[in-house]
Amino acid sequence: GVLQRVGVCFAAVGVLAIWSRAATQWTCLLLLLFGYAALLAAGGTLEPWHNLPSRVDTMLFGDMAYRYDTATGLGHDPEGLLSTLGALASTLIGLRAGALLRDGHPARLLPAAIVLLVLGALWSTWQPLNMNLWTPSYVLWTAGWALAALWLAHMLIDRMQWPPLGRRFGVNAITAYAGSGVTVLALLGTGGWGWLYGNVFD
């Protein structure tokens, strides 16, 4: 699940942030990107339900997988075990981006964003941008946009003193995510979901 993946990434990268140097973190990032890419390539196909991450989820979790097809005996989890390697790589890039800000080098964020976007686009010619598999190309592409957004937010809020309107959501991201799920369940249970789609979103 999403929260389980967030917890794993937070814990693993948190340990690296406290107990390792930058060189070790970069080495781990490269090993994750190229190691996961090699595993995906060795898996033979990236087709839904038949790719290596889905096969691993089926082998480990069986019919307890998030999605399980009883007809084929195949399982799939968009936040599965093997694809967490890609999510760990994304988290490590975030760690290094934060280090640029802490060390007083915010100007490097935008060039880094451009490099990541270019690398992600090039990598996607081999392995496509895919969120469910969290492919290495998806890691680089989304990290590029995230760094560009971080640079822009830093310039507008920290440098130009714009009001930090989204700060409450940023510092309470887990609460906001869980709250959105609770809200959906409440709307479904009270019939409000159908009313919204019939009267507001339609």
List each language-model region with its residue ranges:
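Alpha-helical transmembrane segments and their immediate juxtamembrane cytosolic regions
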Residues: 1-202
